[in-house]
């Protein structure tokens, strides 16, 4: 018998290498690992051991003696085996002394090894059973019938795409079968490769299985999601009314007269600086008012107000008529397809002329009902409160005609009216609920931020637990200040709200980056043309988001030739040290609107010489910036002739050129002035003086009545009788 390694022997007898190593160690044969080479006699001993074990297994199978316990049965079998061995050994006669002695020695060794083996088997309870355990799986496999193929499903659904493995699992087939079918269709695919819709449909049609693709709604873009409510779920909701009109025509005063509060007195300069939302009750029915500022710089906010509104009240002063901002308001309302009620205010004034107002508004297709049109006109006085009841009745009448309804029994959806950063409460947002009911504790996504509604306050300053459709509320609990005009939506849990909020913020960041880096050829040409244009860098900080947007829009509208406004940063809150550092690095001016710099910011501004401009009225901001931009422009110059000299004689000097011997006839000739050479009334050359001398000395200027020597830079064609005219470019103030 030849030599073999441990693992080869184990493989031959279908036993683990560990068992073979264990047996060899019990036989006092040193083995290191499964690669150890076994001698022929060692292999023979191992064969003998495994043969004995298999015989014992066979005996146990046929006899099956009654055993009180497995341990006792093992003892009994061991003793019986040893007795048989002894008897056999005694019965055999000795042929030769030497041979007998050798055989006895061999037998004694074998018996000792067997005894050790069985003792180990007793302790472990494993020895004689190993062969049985190894042999069992083969018989089981032989008995098992072939696997039946799963029945094909009638229909499968998928979302987006499926891998080959996923499709095979859904169809109850092996991936190799799917890969084969794809190969036959000309598609080379691996088990983890994504399949498109066409490939999935081809495979499924081959098996006769229907395919349905699930359409997933991207909730991160919830502004575009339209949820259609059942008609029976809809209930009547209050109308949302926006008051629009020209500055100082009495919008805020009218709203105050309606809700009996004095908002105008709190506003700087008597002009509303940001949107406020209020709710009033009239004849048992509620009306929500949005006060959109009338100054034209707030065009962005007014457009946003028209998007959330149901009815527009166009306030026109009876003594002033239609103004530019009145026309703007009409255009915004028409663009939003919102019905207009015209309120002719200031009827208490003696110079009031409502007919003129109605005549002017007819040019914009606002024809009064009394003149055969369909626009409601209300004559009133906000100051004396005359005609206000009639206006409110008209609002309710129009809202009934519009059939304004919403479903309150769903997750809330709406728009941010205003947002600000409060020192004590953190980010605060005024929300207008447009559908559903907003409750305290709701997980909410607002624009690109998220949070949980911690507290809700109505327009009266009272805490409320829920807000239904068309109700404005101020909420806290957001992680950041949203943008005015952002949409909000309530989600089922805070985890999902956080994921969607973060995803929206990330998407917005990517969009901003792509806008900054994307350049078309047209833009590139424009930038090249604007290469010499100066930029005025600004950092804008304001008390509320609406004011920030309004200031940015107003400043960017300023058009001074040669200067471009660049808003480096615009945000809500006080002016901080980080704003000053940003201004330092970008060479910017900081504008604060209704905010002040903190102590650290003041100190940093003083040390870095950063210009901070603080204002409370928007007109002043625009005027001051315009003035600054005019100062930054390249100054305008005008030509001023300072003297004339007549060429009396010329001298040609090598390495110097032509020297003109002149006599100053008028004014003076200076060394730094520009000159033009005039010959017979025609300008021959314009340039600069190279040298100016009187006798042999260089002089700064030569006055009238004196002679001098002049050389003109890069020009030598000077003749007697020519006139040298000296002039300077003088800076003049820009108009």
Swiss-Prot record:
InterPro entries tied to this protein: EF-G-like_DII (IPR053905), EFTu-like_2 (IPR004161), IF2_II (IPR044145), IF2_N (IPR006847), P-loop_NTPase (IPR027417), Small_GTP-bd (IPR005225), T_Tr_GTP-bd_dom (IPR000795), TF_IF2_bacterial-like (IPR000178)
Region (G2): 270-274
Primary residence: cytoplasm
Region (G5), start-end ranges: 381-383
Biased composition (Low complexity): 134-145
Residue ranges, annotated region (G1): 245-252
GO annotation, cellular component aspect: cytosol
Subcellular location as annotated: Cytoplasm
UniProt feature, compositional bias: Basic residues: 121-133
Chain positions covered by the region annotation Disordered: 52-154
Domain tr-type G: 236-405
Summary of the function given for this chain in its UniProt record: One of the essential components for the initiation of protein synthesis. Protects formylmethionyl-tRNA from spontaneous hydrolysis and promotes its binding to the 30S ribosomal subunits. Also involved in the hydrolysis of GTP during the formation of the 70S ribosomal complex.
Name this protein carries in UniProt: Translation initiation factor IF-2
GN (gene name): infB
């Amino acid at each position: 018998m030849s030599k073999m390694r441990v693992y080869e022997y184990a493989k031959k007898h279908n036993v683990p290498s560990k068992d073979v190593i264990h047996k060899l160690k019990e036989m006092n044969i040193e083995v290191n690992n499964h690669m150890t080479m076994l001698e022929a006699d060692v292999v023979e001993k191992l064969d003998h051991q495994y043969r004995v074990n298999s015989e014992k297994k066979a005996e146990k199978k046929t006899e099956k003696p009654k055993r009180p316990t497995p341990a006792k049965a093992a003892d009994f079998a061991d003793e019986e085996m040893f007795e048989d061995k002894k008897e056999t050994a005694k019965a055999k006669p000795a042929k030769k002394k030497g041979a007998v002695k050798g055989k006895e020695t061999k037998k004694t060794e074998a018996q000792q090894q067997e005894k050790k083996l069985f003792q180990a088997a007793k302790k472990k309870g494993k020895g004689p059973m190993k062969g049985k355990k190894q042999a069992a799986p083969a018989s089981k496999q032989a008995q098992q019938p072939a696997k039946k193929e799963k029945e094909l499903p009638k229909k499968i659904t998928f979302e987006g795409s499926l891998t080959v493995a996923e499709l095979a699992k859904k169809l109850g087939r092996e991936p190799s079968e799917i890969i084969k079918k794809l190969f036959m269709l000309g598609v080379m695919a691996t088990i983890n490769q994504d399949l498109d819709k066409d490939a999935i449909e081809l495979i499924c049609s081959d098996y006769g299985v229907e395919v349905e693709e699930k359409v997933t709604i991207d909730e991160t873009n919830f502004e575009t999601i339209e949820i259609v409510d059942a008609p029976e779920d809809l209930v009547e909701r209050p109308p949302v009314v926006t008051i629009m009109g020209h500055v100082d025509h009495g919008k805020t005063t009218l709203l105050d007269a309606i809700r009996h509060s004095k908002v105008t007195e709190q506003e700087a300069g008597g002009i509303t600086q940001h949107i406020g939302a209020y709710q009033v009750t009239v004849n048992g029915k509620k009306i929500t008012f949005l006060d959109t500022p009338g100054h034209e710089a707030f065009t962005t906010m007014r457009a946003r107000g028209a998007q959330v509104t149901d009815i527009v009240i166009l306030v026109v002063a009876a003594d002033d008529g239609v103004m530019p901002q009145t026309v703007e308001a009409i255009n915004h309302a028409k663009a939003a397809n919102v019905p207009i009620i015209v309120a002719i205010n200031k009827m208490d004034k003696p110079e009031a002329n409502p007919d003129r107002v109605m005549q002017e508004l007819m040019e914009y297709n606002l024809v009064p009902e009394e003149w055969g049109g369909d626009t409601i006109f209300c004559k009133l006085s906000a100051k004396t409160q005359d005609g206000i009841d009639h206006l409110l009745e008209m609002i309710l009448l129009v809202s009934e005609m519009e059939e304004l309804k919403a479903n309150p029994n769903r997750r809330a959806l709406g728009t941010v009216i205003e947002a600000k950063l409060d020192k004590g409460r953190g980010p605060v947002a005024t929300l207008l609920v447009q559908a559903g009911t907003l409750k305290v504790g709701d997980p909410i996504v607002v624009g690109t931020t998220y949070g949980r509604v911690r507290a809700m306050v109505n327009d009266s300053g009272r805490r409320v637990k829920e807000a239904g459709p068309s109700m404005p509320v101020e909420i806290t609990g957001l992680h950041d200040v949203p943008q005015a005009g952002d949409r909000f939506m309530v989600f089922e849990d805070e985890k999902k709200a956080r994921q969607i909020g973060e995803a929206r913020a990330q998407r917005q960041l990517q969009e901003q980056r792509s806008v900054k880096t994307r350049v078309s050829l047209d833009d590139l040409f424009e930038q090249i043309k604007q290469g010499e244009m100066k930029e005025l860098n600004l950092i804008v900080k304001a008390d509320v988001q609406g004011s920030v947007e309004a200031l940015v829009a107003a400043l960017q509208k300023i058009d001074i030739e040669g200067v471009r406004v660049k808003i480096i940063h615009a945000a809500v809150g006080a002016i901080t040290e980080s704003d000053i550092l940003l201004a330092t690095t970008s060479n910017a001016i900081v504008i604060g609107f209704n905010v002040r710099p903190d102590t650290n910011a003041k100190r940093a501004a003083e040390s870095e010489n950063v210009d901070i401009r603080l204002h409370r009225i928007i007109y002043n901001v625009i005027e001051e910036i315009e003035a600054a931009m005019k100062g930054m422009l390249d100054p305008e110059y005008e030509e001023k002739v300072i003297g004339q000299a007549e060429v009396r004689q010329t001298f040609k000097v090598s390495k110097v050129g032509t020297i003109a011997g002149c006599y100053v006839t008028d004014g003076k000739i200076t060394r730094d002035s520009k000159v033009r050479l005039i010959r017979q009334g025609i300008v021959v050359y314009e340039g600069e003086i190279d040298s100016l001398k009187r006798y042999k000395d260089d002089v700064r200027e030569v006055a009238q009545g004196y002679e001098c020597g002049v050389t003109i830079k890069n020009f030598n064609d000077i003749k007697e009788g020519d006139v040298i005219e000296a002039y300077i470019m003088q800076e003049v103030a820009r108009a």
